Amino acid sequence: MTRKLFATLVLVAGVMLMARVQAQPPGSPHETAKATVGGATISVEYGRPYMRGRKIMGSLVPYGQVWRTGADAATTLTTSKALAIGGATVPAGKVTLYTLPAEAGWKLIINKQTGQWGTEYDQAQDLARVDLTKKALSAPVDQLTIAIEPAGDGGVLKISWESTELSVPFTVK
């Protein structure tokens, strides 16, 4: 009798645990922004966190600390041809993108190390740090969005979230 009771309790606990796990809100979805620019195929893979009622700039994304520029794994940029991003040369292949937030001006960090979790930043692997142009948005962006906007033999890489848009021009070499 006690074995049947124990088995029933284990079964009920298991069902309740599964229901609780399934009821949790989804984490940050992952996205790939893609474009063909000047004969180069360019993509940015990143996690897209939501605001979920939180203050983002200066709080969830603190000023003065390197940020993974997304959620979960580090954000990566892959290009089939070399690029000039904000004056820095980025070779064909894959690099990791971090940002250094500041109230006045942000930096885009282009890092040679790839495949790491977003918080595993190694400054010794930096390829370059370039200035980002910061613009206030009139309407908030609820979910982090990265876009590649082609223009001639180059374009603009844009990062938008909350009421902030960051951008940097690039050209295909």
What role is predicted for each listed range?
Residues A7-M16:
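Bacterial N-terminal signal peptides
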